[in-house]
A protein has these predicted regions:
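Hydrophobic alpha-helical connector segments
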Residues: 59, 70-103, 113, 121-125
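Generic hydrophobic, amphipathic alpha-helix propensity
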Residues: 10-18, 35, 60-64, 68
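C-terminal peripheral helix-coil segments that are non-catalytic and often amphipathic
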Residues: 130-134, 164-228
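Short, hydrophobic secondary-structure boundary micro-motifs
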Residues: 104-109, 189-193
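The short coil/loop that forms the "turn" connecting the two helices of the helix-turn-helix
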Residues: 9-10, 41
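Helix-turn-helix
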Residues: 21-55, 59
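Secondary-structure edge/capping motif, primarily at the C-terminal ends of alpha-helices
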Residues: 72-76, 104, 158-166
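Amphipathic alpha-helical packing segments from all-alpha helical-bundle domains
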Residues: 111-163, 167, 171-178
Length: 228
């Protein structure tokens, strides 16, 4: 029993150390040596629980994405048009990546590491089928899975490319939505209404509040305090 509790305690400390380091330094700049030191665990303990940093990223990704959907629902209301909820959630994710470079790196890595992106594909496919099935009658789960692979590539590419004076955040959000909603055969009139709704949101202010709330939630979940 003692060894099981010790393993759980080591896992908790590793997660706490990694999440804090990822947020403060970035995923790529966080070394295994730093994780071991901060978590106060041996290399054998670390590799027995997590084989790579990517394995830790998988747990973090699952938690972060779950929180995003909950927050988006609170912004537009749980009973709203599900397509609008999808638009708000994806636009918030793109905006969060613009507000914080370490978050951008976490998101981009999440869409790159094989086990992570597969988790995203599977979870998002379920959501996409619920949201867009009325527009695509007769489409199966495998059809939505294949479409998710494509729209996830849109998301990764747009998150990885920082905005500038020409490719502004507003243009990025509008282009992403027009591309993804077209994939799911959302009528043009409805697309325009959704784009208008997003344009009238103060998306930067909302995303900043979401980011601060996310940081507080992560601190509570993984028991650490950010230093910056």
């Amino acid at each position: 029993m003692a060894s099981r509790y010790e393993k759980e305690d080591s896992k908790r400390r590793i997660l706490s150390a990694c999440v804090q380091l990822f947020l403060e330094k970035g995923y790529q700049k966080t070394t295994t040596v730093e994780i071991l030191k901060k978590a106060d665990v041996t290399p054998s303990t670390f590799y027995n629980i997590y084989h790579t940093k990517g394995s830790i990223l998988t747990e973090l990704t699952e938690f972060m994405f779950g929180n995003q959907f909950n927050i988006s629902g609170k912004i537009v209301g749980e009973e709203t048009n599900p397509v609008l909820l999808y638009a708000v959630e994806t636009c918030l994710q793109l905006t969060l990546a613009e507000l914080n470079e370490n978050l951008r790196e976490i998101y981009v890595e999440a869409y790159t590491v094989p086990e992570n992106i597969e988790l995203i594909h599977k979870k998002t496919t379920v959501q996409l089928q619920k949201i867009f099935a009325p527009y695509l009658p007769g489409y199966s789960a495998s059809d939505f899975y294949e479409m998710e692979i494509g729209t996830a590539a849109f998301m990764r590419g747009y998150m990885a490319r920082p905005c500038d004076m020409y490719f502004t955040l507003e243009r990025k959000l509008a282009r992403f939505l027009s591309m993804s909603l077209s994939v799911f055969k959302v009528p043009q009139e409805e697309q325009e209404a959704i784009l208008s709704y997003i344009e009238n949101l103060n998306i930067r202010e909302i995303a900043n509040k979401v980011m601060q709330q996310l940081f507080v939630t992560l601190e509570m979940k993984y028991e650490f305090t950010l230093t910056n």
